[in-house]
């Protein structure tokens, strides 16, 4: 399970170091392999452990190749998907096309979302956090069926 947000600097070769607390699990449970792709509605990258990505692929297989929307959805996720291996220092290389998609330069945020990570350009992460906070404040959470009884 991945949780928390970590500020990570990307080096000149396009590598980021996965936080140490996740490295052993990724190596042991997922053979050090993660799959990186684009998000469908935000300028960030999604990073899935191999086992989690295989579940996504199974769902994508069920989508139509003849329905234009479903085909476009598959193309976006699968067309950008890249296998990435943790090196001996726990780093992964972010492919140039994916760096460009998410406008990644040096300062990034790696955000754990239980079964995957999101990778954001740092200022874009802050902006979406501000936007998300404003959205939460402006909404009646009780009107959302899944949030109505959510308690912390």
Curated annotation (Swiss-Prot):
Family: Belongs to the MraZ family.
Pfam family, one: MraZ
Assembly, per entry: Forms oligomers.
GO BP terms: negative regulation of DNA-templated transcription initiation
Subcellular location: Cytoplasm, Nucleoid
Keywords: Cytoplasm, DNA-binding, Repeat, Transcription, Transcription regulation
Domain of life: Bacteria
Molecular function, one GO term: DNA-binding transcription factor activity
Species this chain originates from: Shewanella frigidimarina (strain NCIMB 400)
Record domain SpoVT-AbrB: where: 5-52, 81-124
UniProt name for this protein: Transcriptional regulator MraZ
GO cellular component, one term: nucleoid
Gene name, Swiss-Prot/TrEMBL: mraZ
Lineage, highest ranks first: Bacteria, Pseudomonadati, Pseudomonadota, Gammaproteobacteria, Alteromonadales
Family annotation (Gene3D superfamilies): Transcriptional regulator MraZ domain
This protein's record includes keyword Nucleotidyltransferase: no
């Amino acid at each position: 399970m991945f949780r928390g947000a970590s500020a990570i600097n990307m080096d000149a070769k396009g590598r980021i170091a996965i936080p140490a607390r996740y490295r052993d699990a990724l190596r042991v449970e997922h053979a050090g392999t993660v799959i990186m792709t684009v998000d469908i509605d935000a300028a960030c990258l999604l990073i899935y452990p191999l086992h989690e990505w295989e579940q996504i692929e199974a769902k994508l297989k069920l989508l139509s190749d003849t329905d234009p929307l479903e085909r476009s959805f598959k193309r976006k996720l699968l067309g950008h998907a890249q296998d990435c291996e943790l090196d001996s220092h726990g780093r992964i290389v972010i492919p140039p096309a994916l760096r460009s998609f998410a406008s990644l330069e040096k300062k990034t945020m790696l955000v754990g979302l239980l079964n995957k990570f999101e990778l954001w350009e740092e200022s874009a992460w802050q902006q979406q956090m501000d936007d998300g906070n404003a959205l939460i404040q402006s909404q009646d959470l009780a009107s959302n069926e899944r949030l109505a009884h959510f308690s912390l």
